[in-house]
Amino acid sequence: MTIINELDGAKVIKQTKNDATQKLSVMFFEEKKGVTIEVAITGLAIAKYEDEEETGLYLFMCDKDWAVQDDHKVETVEEAIAWAEKNFDITEEDWL
């Protein structure tokens, strides 16, 4: 299992395991030529930008390679965990 220290320049505070066989969600991206690309979300991470003046954290939704596909801004780790539990099939025990 890979432990991630940084994503998109933000310091990772907590993460789930990233198992390519477990799809937490699917995102669809439409390309210019009308082709739709499907990307499975297989891992989540809670992270903070150290140089950001404002407070808050981000819940990153990542693909199997830990590439960030989307994010959700939250104020606390607890809020991020609660939001993830509500929107994905995970529990507090899934966090590392």
Regions picked out by a protein language model, each given a short descriptive name:
Residues F29-E30, E50, L59, D89:
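Compositionally biased, intrinsically disordered low-complexity regions enriched in proline and serine
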Residues M1-I37:
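Negatively charged, low-complexity tracts enriched in Asp/Glu with abundant Ser/Thr
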Residues L7, L24, L44, L57-L59, ...:
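Generic detector of leucine side chains in alpha-helical contexts
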Residues D8, N18, I37-E38, G43-A45, ...:
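N-terminal cationic amphipathic segment used for targeting or macromolecule association
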Residues I37-Q69:
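Short aromatic-glycine-(Arg/Gly/Cys) micro-motifs in beta-strand/loop hairpins
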Residues G56-L96:
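Short, compact, well-ordered microdomains
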